[in-house]
């Protein structure tokens, strides 16, 4: 607040992506979002709003957007990334004289038009703004212990779905990169040894994971995994869980030999 010469900062908690989609907001500004990362019906619900899309390529969002504003790709602008150690790594534009404007420039122009200026006409000015704030040297929150979440009760033919995204998968930024996709991990379903015995399957046999929404059928791998759990990649070839099952994780699913 001091760095920006204001009395206080907003204290209200913002809306999550799901809350924004389900809200009565008439217009939304979206940049770098794949609706299939949110929910199976996200695209349908967003299509009912006035969507302004900041994009570098055609996507599911540009298909439903009322306005599409092309923005500069990383190679066309300067900027910075923060690595896993929290260190800022700056970079400069590799392609000079690009016709596309940076996303911060477009955001600043939109803010000016709606009467809420942020005064960040360039990436450099945004960088200066961030650096003026400096590092936090105030009180830090205490680490508190959290109780373990109880394991859901499941039947003999059921399991709790566990899932995450592989580094190389069906992510939208990997579209068209067939050679890169060829190095991705194969899609598998991971089950415990006891579940494999119950199902009567061996390594690489097909196993079907399903719910009332849909199903995924993949070769199985038997591993040291919690007996009540089954693992499936979240967004890989033949295993796009939001699209196929309508869920991503921690849901009860049926598991059977295919």
Task: Walk through the language-model features, giving the residues of each.
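A cross-kingdom feature strongest in bacterial/archaeal respiratory oxidoreductases
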Residues: 2-99, 105-117, 121-258
């Amino acid at each position: 607040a001091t760095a920006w010469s204001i009395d206080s900062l907003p204290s209200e908690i913002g809306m999550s992506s799901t809350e924004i989609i389900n809200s009565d907001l008439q217009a939304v500004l979206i940049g770098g979002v794949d609706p299939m990362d949110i929910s199976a019906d996200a695209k349908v619900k967003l299509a009912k709003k006035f969507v302004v899309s900041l994009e570098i390529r055609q996507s599911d969002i540009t298909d439903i957007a009322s306005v599409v504003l092309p923005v500069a790709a990383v190679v066309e602008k300067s900027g910075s990334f923060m690595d896993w150690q929290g260190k800022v790594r700056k970079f400069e534009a590799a392609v000079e004289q690009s016709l596309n404007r940076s996303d911060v420039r477009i955001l600043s122009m939109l803010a000016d038009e709606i009467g809420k200026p942020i005064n960040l006409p360039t990436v450099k000015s945004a960088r200066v703004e961030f650096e003026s704030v400096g590092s936090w040297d105030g009180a830090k929150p205490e680490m508190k212990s959290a109780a373990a979440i109880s394991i859901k009760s499941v039947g003999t033919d059921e399991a709790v779905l566990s899932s995450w995204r592989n580094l190389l998968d069906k992510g939208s930024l990997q579209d068209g990169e067939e050679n890169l996709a060829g190095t991705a991990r194969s899609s598998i379903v991971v089950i415990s040894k006891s579940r494999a015995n119950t199902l009567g399957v061996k390594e690489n046999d097909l196993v079907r994971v399903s719910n009332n929404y849909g199903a995924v059928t993949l070769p199985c791998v038997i591993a040291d995994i919690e007996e009540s759990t089954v693992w499936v990649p979240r967004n890989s070839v033949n295993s796009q869980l939001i699209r196929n099952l309508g869920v991503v994780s921690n849901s009860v699913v049926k598991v059977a030999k295919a």
